[in-house]
């Protein structure tokens, strides 16, 4: 109670000591108007202000349009300004989601304890009846914001909430100005559509992802949509070495680095794809596809992740061949060219592994050229893997048969189309990835069968 009394006394003191009152655009009341609004809303951009005017400094040099003074554009009372900025600062600290050089805030704006923003502090912050005189806790839907963060970053589909929700993205356009680069509000009716839209994103862009659990020492996999952060990072970034770092099976650890501002801009462009159901911008899809066709520019782990992200993004564009399962009946030219290259890669990979050699396969070395001129480089790749087919012997028969069946699918197309094929699109990547996933499943079954056989032998002994 003493704390509240001090706050009231301070507000009364300010009201008496400050200048004459005017109409506040926020509260709709005659109150003392604020001239200098707070800064340091966001720690990373400490000097940036959301509301500011420097007319006295640049008078005569800045075109102000129909306004002669800053107050004609908008005038906000001191109390409203303090409440707005402190609430925003608190929201950023409590449930902000960093996206590059920007910050995303999601919060509930229509809870029962937020009926009057300019009422008492208890009404504004929301008081927990069970806590009596304890510090008030605002109902800004923290749990929802956390679930949204997981949804946006590709980890969860069900947000499970029924309140009115707002989304806000802030960025510092300059060192002194903070701007709103994205804002969207969902009421009770729109919320149900929002949930369907987010779920649709996760369903439409899901793919199988593999990662290594260093703590348990095992590989894990899960079908999920990629995070928009990963999409933006791989679309805009380049691979760099991590000093002193190592990753299993790859020697030096590699990471993807990108310009913070470009990364943030791309993530903001992807937000409507998750929240509003828009298609992924075509230029982002093209960047991912172009980079996926350069496997030698990445470590094996990063390229595999890039490949899966690319498939997740482009699969909605090529629905006939966009499944994670192989479409064996398809005679699509780019799709089957991709499948054929996967077979060539697998044959050489198995031969190199049996000989304890570790180097890139010819399929990987010629991947980029193959995508540009598939008919020409198909013959070149075939000539280079013949020796490995011979080395594998009977072990390569099923792979050779698969490669032969794919060739038969290709031959159902007119010869002139096969010869004229150039610069294969995303269907090649989808075909390659689907075929490699089939090989991985078969390899896992073989490993499991081998382990069971060894266990039976040990039991017999």
Predicted region positions:
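Short amphipathic alpha-helical segments and helix-helix/interface helices
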Residues: 11-15
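Short metal-coordination and nucleic-acid-contact micro-motifs, chiefly zinc-binding Cys/His arrays
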Residues: 16-22
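Extended alpha-helical scaffolding segments
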Residues: 1-8, 31-461
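Short Cys/His-rich metal-coordination motifs, predominantly Zn2+-binding knuckles/fingers
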Residues: 27-29
């Amino acid at each position: 109670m003493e704390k509240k009394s001090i706050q009231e006394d301070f507000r009364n003191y300010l009201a008496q000591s400050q200048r004459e009152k005017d109409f506040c655009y926020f509260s709709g009341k005659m109150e003392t108007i604020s001239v200098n609004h707070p800064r340091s809303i966001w720690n990373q951009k400490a000097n940036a202000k959301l509301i500011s005017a420097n007319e006295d400094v640049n008078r005569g040099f800045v075109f102000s349009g129909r306004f002669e003074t800053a107050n004609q554009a908008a005038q906000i009372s001191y109390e409203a300004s303090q409440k707005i900025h402190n609430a925003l600062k608190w929201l950023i600290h409590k449930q902000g989601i960093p996206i590059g050089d920007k910050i995303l805030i999601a919060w509930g704006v229509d809870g029962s304890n937020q009926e009057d923003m300019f009422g008492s502090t208890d009404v504004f912050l929301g008081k927990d009846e069970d806590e009596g005189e304890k510090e008030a806790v605002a109902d800004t839907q923290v749990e929802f914001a956390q679930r949204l963060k997981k949804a946006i970053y590709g980890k969860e589909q069900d947000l499970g909430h029924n309140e009115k929700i707002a989304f806000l993205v802030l960025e510092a356009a300059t060192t002194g100005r903070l701007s709103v680069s994205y804002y969207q509000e969902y009421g009770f009716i729109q919320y149900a559509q929002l949930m369907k839209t987010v779920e649709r994103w996760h369903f439409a862009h899901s793919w199988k992802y593999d990662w290594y659990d260093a703590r348990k020492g095992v590989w894990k996999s899960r079908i999920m949509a990629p995070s928009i952060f990963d999409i933006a990072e791989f679309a805009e970034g380049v691979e760099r070495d991590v000093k002193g770092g190592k990753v299993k099976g790859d020697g030096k650890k590699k990471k993807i680095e990108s310009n913070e501002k470009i990364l943030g801009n791309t993530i903001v462009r992807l937000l409507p794809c998750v929240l509003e159901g828009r298609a992924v911008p075509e230029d982002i899809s093209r960047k991912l596809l172009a980079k996926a066709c350069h496997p030698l520019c990445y470590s094996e782990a990063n390229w595999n992740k890039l490949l899966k992200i690319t498939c997740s993004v482009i699969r909605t564009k090529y629905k006939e061949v966009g499944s994670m399962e192989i479409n064996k009946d398809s005679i699509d030219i780019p799709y089957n060219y991709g499948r054929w290259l996967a077979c060539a890669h697998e044959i050489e990979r198995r031969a190199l592994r049996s000989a304890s050699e570790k180097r890139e396969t010819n399929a990987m070395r010629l991947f980029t050229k193959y995508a540009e001129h598939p008919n020409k480089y198909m013959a070149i790749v075939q000539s280079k893997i013949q020796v490995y087919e011979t080395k594998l012997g009977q072990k390569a028969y099923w792979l050779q048969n698969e490669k032969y069946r794919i060739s038969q699918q290709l031959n159902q197309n007119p010869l002139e189309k096969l010869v004229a094929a150039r610069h294969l699109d995303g269907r090649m990547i989808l075909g390659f990835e689907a075929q490699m996933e089939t090989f991985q499943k078969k390899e896992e079954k073989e490993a499991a069968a081998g382990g069971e056989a060894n266990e039976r032998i040990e039991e017999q002994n």
